[in-house]
Amino acid sequence: DLANNFSVYFKKFKKKLSKYMQDAIIKGNKHSGKEYAEAIDFMKRSYESYQEVFEDYHGVLSPSSPGVAPKGLKSTGTAEFNKVWSYLGTPCISLPLLEGENNLPLGVQLIGDKYDDHRFLGVARWLEKECEE
């Protein structure tokens, strides 16, 4: 999906894109239209099974990353734990609610349901306030 959405920018601004983005677009462009359609269908079916969670809960908590935030400002760390939620099209937000080694933040990720951003952000605000106390 990334390749499909960013190929125009790749053609015009390739040198301005990070190596990661360039590689991801090149890799994505190797898939056929049929493979892309199958992936979109799989994503829709995956979301349908995930959506059942929100019949009983307002959000899902998970780690934001495998560890604490990296030192400095060069990187925000890995986005591996966020990819599945982006793939499903669900909102997710990382909140620095915990503290790890060297007083670096350890993020907790809150995941919400599609098209329910107002409630999702309210739950995020509530969670942040509860953890401050």
What are these regions (language model features)?
Residues 1, 77-78, 108-111:
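Short low-complexity, flexible loop/linker segments enriched in glycine and/or proline
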Residues 3, 78-81, 124:
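Amphipathic alpha-helical segments in well-structured domains
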Residues 37-41, 87-133:
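Structural helix-boundary/capping segments
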Residues 38, 65-84:
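Short, surface-exposed loop/helix-turn segments at secondary-structure junctions
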